Amino acid sequence: MLIDDRVINGQERISFMLRSLYSQHGYERYRMSKFEEYDLYSRNKDFLFSEGVITFTDTTGRLMALKPDVTLSIVKNRKDTPGSLQKLYYHENVYRVSGAADGFREQTQVGLECMGEVDDACIAEVLRLAAESLRLCSPDFMLEVSHLGILNAFVDAIAPEEKVKQAILACAGQKNLHGISGICRENHLAEGAENALIRLLGLYGTPRTVMPKIRELAEEFGAGEMAGQLSRSVAGFTGGDLEEKIQIDFSATGDLRYYNGIAFKGFISGIPGSVLSGGQYDKLMRKMGRKDRAIGFAVFLDMLERLTEEETTRA
């Protein structure tokens, strides 16, 4: 379908193309209210991108909140579907404290969620759609993929204590190798305990170039099966037109209280920070009483404001 640039702006054009992409792959539009009961967010505040939430009291006396997140609302309002798959996409506004400005800001997201019998093929499709989403935004992009189970196995081998483990994971997310070594020294851990993790974090590149090394290293820590899942999830990119746009990078992390398995972030040249973020969140599903598996991602349209008109035009 042709899009008339005279009547819509760049963000609207990208949003239209993303929604069309997801519909073509069998995802159905999901619409939701602008607000939820505040308790949903207070119980899952560590899952949110920012701490602040706009609240108000409705006419029945309930404390409500303008939604700061989409995924929590979808998980809460959908039911498990044993033996089947729910494929949903959304175009919604969220209300968060912006890191670039004081106070709250309305931010637009387009994304998708896949819930139910999520298998390797489903994960591979979601990764492909994440890459295609970035390409619709700009040809100069990179999708970084990791596996939190593998990362967790390496960190567990260093520090079983949760507080130390979280500090190491935070450094891993920043690729702060000196910070990891410093934490190990401060907590009197075995000399060289962090060496394998540092080797893992140093493996950065296309799946073809780094997966053999990752699988070999993961086997030493009992994470061979998870390395196999990572390999299968990205195998479809090898030899294709997107191969050089996919990088394995274990600094793509998420909160292990909510996320598990595959995690990924998308970047576009000239824009600081990720414009796309996603991953598997089976742990969040369990926390909210759900049995389904789940994976999804969001594209942060407000981050694309810096793109020029030329960059936001489909090649």
PLM feature spans:
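General small-molecule cofactor/ligand-binding pocket signal
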Residues: 30, 144, 247-249
